[in-house]
């Protein structure tokens, strides 16, 4: 872990950074760096497919071996034929090094994309810029890599680790904030709703705010650092996750109610639009 605890000087520029897949680093100011789409497409289309074929060969060989052990009294010609098939499968397995070659290429692609995105982002920074990131559980990413071969979480964790290491090495300040609800809450009216996000799109079910989902998360990550009330809630409840989520949910609910009171015209307009849409159907 490379977290720095930094003060909040008013003169500093603050970047909220969402670490994702479609866009590797999406900033609160709308800029974005890198993408994992091509890398993950290669993994799913080439690496997974290749290992699937490799596994199929091994399963066929295993079935023949099991059949031979179970049936001791097979005719000689049948037994010889099955042994020949098993030998052929064994030779195919020994020659099938493509899965591991493709897997190595995947890691090379992954490392290059992360390196390029990190260097591009860090090169764009002023010295007084503070980078705000989500606090990610790197252990879970490593577990994901070992257990189920799904590399999207692993890639995201690796990218953020590399970014923190580089920021630390280059002398830039950064801080991590708890990630709860940063992808679900509306940065405009504070409406907290899972339905706000649909893939890469964000559309608030309350005020109608819409935008890129990763950009929206970057905005919320920045707010999680700058908003003193949010910071206090997170700090006071960092060892009790259930209470933390309850406090955050309550805080956003109160802010949303206040927003509705201060901007009633937005909700009247939204209600009229919904009624017109309903009558049209």
What are these regions (language model features)?
Residues 1-281:
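Positively charged, helix-rich recognition surfaces that bind polyanionic ligands
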